[in-house]
Each structure stands twice: as C-alpha cells, then as structure tokens.
Amino acid sequence: MTGPRRIHDVEGLNARLQAVTRRANIDLRYLHDDRTREHVVAATRDARRILDMGGGMRDRLGALGGRVETMDLNDIDEPGSNLSRPDILGDACSPFPEWMHGRYDAVIALALLEHVYDPGAAVANFRAALAPGGRLFLYVPWMWRYHAPRSLVFQDYQRFSRDGLAWLLRDFDEVTLYPIRGRFSAIANMARWWKPRVERRFGGRINRWLDVRTPDWRNAVQASGYFAEAVKSTAQE
C-alpha cells in the first residue's frame, strides 16, 4: 500500500512555522493591568520621529509636537472629539513612497490591523518605514466582537491569535507579545457594558478575580487581544 503523493516538504514547513511561534517572547505583565499606552510613551520618549497609524496615540504624544506624524485612510476632522486630520492621507496596505522608508524610529498601530484588508502588506510597510533598530508597537484583537460602524467608514476584517501575530512579525529581529485579559475576562469583555461599567470601576483586579479560577490562567493563547513590540534589525538593508 502506497502513501499519499507528496507535493511539499510538509514536515519541514511545520517545523519552520512552529519555530516562528516559539521565538516570540511572551510577557504577562499586562494580562490584568493594561498599561500598554504608558509603555509606548516611555519607549518612544527619545524617538526622533514617530509614525502613529490611525492616530491612536495622539492624546498621549501631543507633547512631542512635530516629532509625531499621523497617517489615516480617512480625512476626518471633528471638533470636540479625539479625531483630527492626519498629517498623511494614505492606505496602510499599499506600498509607502520612498521618502517614508527608514524615516521613523517608531511606528505605532494600535487597534488598526483588524481594520485593514491586507495585514501582511501593512506590516511590511511599517517595517520599511522604520529606521534600523526602530520599533513597531501594535495592539490587535483576538477574542473580540465585530466593531465597524454602520457607515463602514472603516471596516472590520481580521482577528489575530498568538500564532498569527508571531507569523506577521516574523521578519523582525525581536518580538514580544503581551496578552491582554485571560480566558474568562476576555469573554466578559465581549459584553459592551463590561469595560465602561465594570473594568473602569474595579480596575484589572476584577479580571484577575475571574481568570485565576482555572489552574492554567497564566496562558498566552486565550486573550481578548495582544499588545506587541517588534524590533527591526540594526543592519542596513
């Protein structure tokens, strides 16, 4: 009896895929204490130029003035809201122009990749925009509800597991993933009232109280999302 007709080195491929996932560092410090925005502020304090994709950090980085450039697909200016016109109007998934290559010490894309139609192309653009040794900061959802507006001024395309995010960041030298929330707190967070009414009142301790009821609560795979920091090689390309 003959086996299946082999058309690919499937064992070698699976070994390479496993290696990509396993090389990502896992840090649980923000599992029940989401201080990721403070993390970004501290890590970019000395950056010469920062690209904030979608403007998700505009409220925290305003003191840096002209060192921060924002980019968005939509030209929105709404007085009284946290929205303002971007410095650069463009598509995260289409090739960035040459003048943007190597321009930034940090690229920030918080809660953005789920809204783009080609996250692999977007991450490649972010990497190209970074100077050697530059850092990419991401937040992506995993266990989270659909959240595009009815107007579809932006869309909701993707969710990212630990393995999927590690694969997206495979071309960076160093990758650290920070799970946000655990198994049960991620489920609770699916309710629209959980974060504004419960988390904001009790803080991260309420999520910890929910999650520690299982022996494997310090896990990296059942999360509402992931904050990630990825470092580009210092070698010139």
Residue positions per predicted region:
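Glycine-rich, phosphate-binding/catalytic loops in enzymes
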Residues: 66-70, 86-87, 124-129, 154-156
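Residues lining the SAM
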Residues: 110-113, 139
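Conserved N-terminal segment of class I S-adenosyl-L-methionine
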Residues: 1-106, 110, 223-226, 233-237
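S-adenosyl-L-methionine-dependent methyltransferase catalytic module, highlighting the catalytic core
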Residues: 117-127, 135-237
